[in-house]
Amino acid sequence: MKVIFMGTPEFAVPTLKKLIIHHEVKAVFTQQPKAKGRGLHLAKSPIHQLAFEHQIPVYSPSTLRNDETINLIKKIDADIIVVIAYGFIVPKAILEAKKYGCLNIHPSDLPRHRGAAPLQRTIIEGDRKSSVCIMRMDSGLDTGDILLKEDLNLERRITLDELSNKCAHLGAELLIKTLANIDNIVPIKQSSNGITYAHKLTKAEGKINWYESAYSIDCKIRGMNPWPGAYFSYNDKIIKILRAEYFNYNHHFIPGTVINNKLEIACGSGILRVKKLQQESKKALNIEEFLRGTNILKDTILK
């Protein structure tokens, strides 16, 4: 099958690799190179780099909502468009431009966690089950019919990297299965029950509320690493917690209290044991290294 691929981050790479092996990728659309590092050098997206290595034509328009881009896509000889974490809204004219429309890989149990941050919200909300869906896109926000779906049982303390990697590779496999059988698949409409929205994360959401349970805070730490990071302030400095573990111990402390010299912190329920931190503008450190340079005293109440 002849495919136009639209995607940007590392999450989309396994699918493009599979498409290159099993199908004919006619063009790739990805976000424009962005300035990175101290030298602010322009860096191509992972998808741009992969397409370049395979000599696939790459386009990086600033929008899909203009006649020039729409006409370009219509002229490309392709049967289908595959969209994964591209970063732009796809207008109706493009959704309907090819014989089989546009397919999307969405890493959640739709209609739960529709929107921009399904992986993060899955972890933050402590979900123990998820899914990867192959969806035929329509004009709504992740409201299209499901062509193929596979459920996942999640480890209790799965990290964002682990979940992303698992969903990326499963999604690639499911997409290839979908394309192989696309003429015979009966699309299934999404349920009108259980709809939730995985809104894009904000920096303010990263601030830790110590009155929440230790488990909820641990979920936030895992779901918000690397960005925006779950953080607290100490001596007017922002400190991100990159890794921790929780214990469902009963205690009598005010939430936010440092209960010993190992940086174990009382929460609304349970105790959080911090394992790795990063103070703003400094490198990440394990707890032993951190405490050698920053002395957070027992009985301190963190904000």
From Swiss-Prot:
Q: Mind listing the UniProt keywords for this protein, alphabetically?
A: Protein biosynthesis, Transferase
According to its UniProt record, which protein family does this protein belong to?
A: Belongs to the Fmt family.
- Identify one Gene Ontology CC term for this UniProt entry: cytosol
In terms of Pfam families, this protein maps to:
Formyl_trans_C (PF02911), Formyl_trans_N (PF00551)
Q: SUPFAM superfamilies annotated for this entry?
A: FMT C-terminal domain-like (SSF50486), Formyltransferase (SSF53328)
Gene this chain is encoded by: fmt
Give the source's domain of life in one word: Bacteria
Q: Which residues bind (6S)-5,6,7,8-tetrahydrofolate?
A: S108, D109, L110, P111
**Per the record, what are the reactions this protein catalyses?**
L-methionyl-tRNA(fMet) + (6R)-10-formyltetrahydrofolate = N-formyl-L-methionyl-tRNA(fMet) + (6S)-5,6,7,8-tetrahydrofolate + H(+)
Q: What does this protein do?
A: Attaches a formyl group to the free amino group of methionyl-tRNA(fMet). The formyl group appears to play a dual role in the initiator identity of N-formylmethionyl-tRNA by promoting its recognition by IF2 and preventing the misappropriation of this tRNA by the elongation apparatus.
Any idea which GO molecular function terms this record carries? methionyl-tRNA formyltransferase activity
What is this enzyme's EC? 2.1.2.9
Q: What is the lineage of its organism?
A: Bacteria, Pseudomonadati, Pseudomonadota, Alphaproteobacteria, Rickettsiales
Name of the protein this chain belongs to: Methionyl-tRNA formyltransferase
